[in-house]
């Protein structure tokens, strides 16, 4: 669940925090006793010299030492939380936040969010940023087992071979002489119909293997030997699921989700086995105890919390566990209080669909018809872009949804719609080529962004969600949901359930305890503020 930070929205929320700063305590029913820790642990906060040019000016940098496992806090195992603190003039207390995710970095977001705080908030409250476990400068990174690596980029789709879209400099493929535009026809005597065949062949190899690659260059057949290298996978996942469904035509969702579940389970199992001292300890149950340890280490009896998107799950769990530690809380883009893996996955396509309906109304009324034409066209055709890549309905759905995550990106979204529409409907070849050229640039930018997000956040996203929510979705349940979602929202929508349902192969008993949840009342001194806005994704 991604949080989008915009100046207007942040200004509105922090003005709410400023208002709360002056609210007399509204006394609710007596709060339940604070849940005791299993054993006492004295958190330590160690300050260090901040990197040059750190912002805002005067920020303090620190590491908080906490137990690896709050269920056994005195077993001697610890980890560290990366912290930033900007002290206030009046020192009335602290305000902390989480920007969303799971996987969002509070340290990275710290300067930008601080710059938008109202002056009265800055004057009264210390501002505190931190990276949750597994994120940024905090401990418990997920490192995957060594995976086979050749450094090939492949054009999606195809049927007469796998076209190379590029090679990573210095990679085994580059050293062997393969270049962009080569079309791989065989690997070790096996016929390659498309890029997926090549990926499967590489996955079956081990570092050090020799792969004999036959390919076409300028129509002439050639052959090279590629020595398979290795790379730390970092428990890396695809942008949503390991493989796309068919590029065109009807989708057998039962077959797709079973294949996806098998692939995801293999990744999850390997990642968990490779990280016995980190993967089981990433859940929000652990994070809220880190958060309360940070409060204690900074000397606040209570403090203020602002959660965005996934950060509201942290806020809800913290409030339910430590209600007497909160002075005021703002839930910005709140998740449900009683989440499930099934609910998280199946609600995502509907939420994305709502943003698709709001986009034309807010930014481009003429785009609605064009979007419909594009989706209908892509259901039957793969668009060949001028940069040598292809755009499928799955690419379009994910890339366009990414653009709608922030209204500041609406102009780019409008350009994507207009130019792709022109590329498939314009009257002349020149007009179509011009439209596809612009669409290709936008598509490549979004493709790179989604790949970067997957590399940086997907593993933490999966392990936090699967630790927090202990129900497990089956491929059959996803298939049944997909059929309904497809009828209501279009063929491309069910695919977006993937990462939110990616708990295959992760038994709850091997992970952190589930978050406290439920619909029972949480009694706080100051009533919480919930902030929602149209167009949230």
Can you name each region flagged by the protein language model?
Residues 2-15, 27-144, 233-258, 374, ...:
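Catalytic-loop region of hydrolases
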Residues 524, 529-532:
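Short beta-strand/loop motif that positions the catalytic acidic residue
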Residues 300-310:
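Alpha/beta-hydrolase fold nucleophile elbow
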Residues 309-314, 322:
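Active-site loop->helix "elbow" adjoining a glycine-rich segment at hydrolase catalytic centers
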Residues 238, 245, 369-524:
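Alpha/beta-hydrolase fold active-site neighborhood
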Residues 288-302:
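Conserved acidic catalytic loop of the alpha/beta-hydrolase fold
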Residues 143-144, 233-249, 317-372, 418-436, ...:
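A catalytic-pocket lid/entrance helix-loop region that shapes and gates access to the active site
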Residues 145-148, 163, 175, 179, ...:
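PDZ-domain C-terminal substructure recognizer with occasional recognition of PDZ-binding tails
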């Amino acid at each position: 669940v991604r949080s989008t930070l915009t100046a207007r929205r942040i200004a509105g929320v922090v003005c709410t925090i400023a208002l709360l700063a002056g609210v007399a305590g509204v006394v609710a029913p007596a709060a339940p006793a604070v849940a005791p820790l299993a054993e006492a642990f004295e958190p330590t906060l160690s300050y260090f010299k901040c990197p040059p040019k750190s912002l805002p000016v005067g920020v303090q940098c620190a590491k908080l030492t906490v137990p690896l496992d709050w269920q056994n806090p005195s077993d001697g195992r610890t980890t560290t939380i990366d912290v930033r603190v900007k002290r206030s003039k009046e020192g009335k207390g602290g305000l902390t936040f989480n920007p969303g995710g799971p996987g969002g970095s509070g340290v990275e977001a710290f300067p930008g969010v601080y710059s938008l705080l109202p002056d009265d908030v800055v004057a009264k409250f210390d501002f505190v940023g931190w990276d949750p476990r597994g994120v940024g400068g905090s401990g418990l990174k997920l490192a995957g087992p060594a995976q086979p690596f050749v450094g090939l980029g492949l054009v999606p789709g195809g049927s007469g071979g796998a076209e190379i879209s590029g090679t990573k400099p210095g990679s085994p493929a580059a050293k062997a002489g393969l270049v962009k535009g080569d079309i791989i026809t065989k690997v070790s005597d096996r016929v390659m119909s498309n890029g997926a065949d090549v990926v499967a062949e590489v996955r079956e190899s081990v570092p050090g293997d020799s792969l004999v690659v036959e390919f076409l260059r300028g129509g002439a057949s050639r052959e090279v030997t590629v020595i398979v290298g290795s790379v730390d996978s970092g428990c890396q996942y695809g942008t949503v699921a390991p493989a796309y469904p068919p590029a065109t035509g009807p989708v057998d969702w039962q077959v797709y989700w079973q294949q996806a579940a098998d692939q995801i389970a293999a990744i999850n199992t390997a990642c968990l086995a490779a990280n016995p001292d980190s993967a089981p300890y990433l859940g929000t149950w652990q994070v809220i105890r880190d958060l309360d340890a940070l409060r204690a280490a900074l000397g606040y009896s209570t403090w203020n919390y602002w959660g965005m998107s996934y950060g509201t799950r942290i806020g809800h769990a913290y409030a339910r566990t430590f209600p007497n530690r909160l002075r005021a809380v703002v839930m910005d883009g709140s998740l449900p209080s009683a989440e499930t893996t099934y609910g998280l996955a199946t609600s995502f396509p509907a939420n994305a669909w709502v943003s698709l309906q709001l986009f034309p109304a807010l930014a481009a009324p003429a785009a609605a018809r064009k979007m419909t034409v594009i989706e209908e066209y892509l259901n039957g055709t793969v668009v060949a872009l001028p940069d040598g890549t292809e755009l499928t309905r799955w690419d379009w759905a994910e890339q366009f949804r990414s653009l709608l995550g922030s209204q500041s990106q609406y102009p780019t979204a409008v350009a994507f719609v207009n130019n792709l529409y022109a590329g498939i409907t314009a009257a002349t070849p020149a007009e179509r080529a011009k439209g596809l050229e612009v669409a290709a640039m936008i598509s490549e930018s979004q493709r790179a962004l989604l790949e970067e997000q997957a590399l940086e956040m997907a593993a933490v996203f999966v392990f936090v969600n699967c630790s927090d929510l202990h129900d497990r979705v089956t491929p059959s349940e996803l298939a049944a949901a997909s059929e309904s979602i497809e009828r209501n929202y279009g063929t491309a929508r069910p695919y977006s359930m993937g990462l939110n349902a990616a708990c295959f192969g992760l038994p709850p008993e091997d992970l952190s305890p589930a978050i406290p949840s439920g619909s029972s009342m949480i009694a706080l001194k100051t009533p919480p503020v919930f902030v929602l806005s149209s167009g949230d994704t």
